């Protein structure tokens, strides 16, 4: 491996979720913000709910127009 070309790896990076949960992982970033984690994701909680962040269909229609 070449020296001095790799990013600095942090062994204790804080990850904060929109639900308020925080945990520590290793990463090249100082802090990470996520919308879903294992504490609030429907797959892990067993809840039946739709997870659609920022409406993908609406984003598509805004970008390309509603031609239908």
From Swiss-Prot:
One of its GO terms (cellular component) is ribonucleoprotein complex. Its cofactor is Zn(2+). Belongs to the bacterial ribosomal protein bL31 family. Type A subfamily. InterPro entries: Ribosomal_bL28/bL31-like_sf (IPR034704), Ribosomal_bL31 (IPR002150), Ribosomal_bL31_A (IPR027491), Ribosomal_bL31_sf (IPR042105). GO terms for biological process: translation. Binds 1 zinc ion per subunit. Part of the 50S ribosomal subunit. It comes from Dehalococcoides mccartyi (strain ATCC BAA-2266 / KCTC 15142 / 195). Keywords: Metal-binding, Ribonucleoprotein, Ribosomal protein, RNA-binding, rRNA-binding, Zinc. Gene3D superfamilies: Ribosomal protein L31. Zn(2+) binds at residues 17, 19, 37, 40. This is Large ribosomal subunit protein bL31. It comes from the Bacteria.
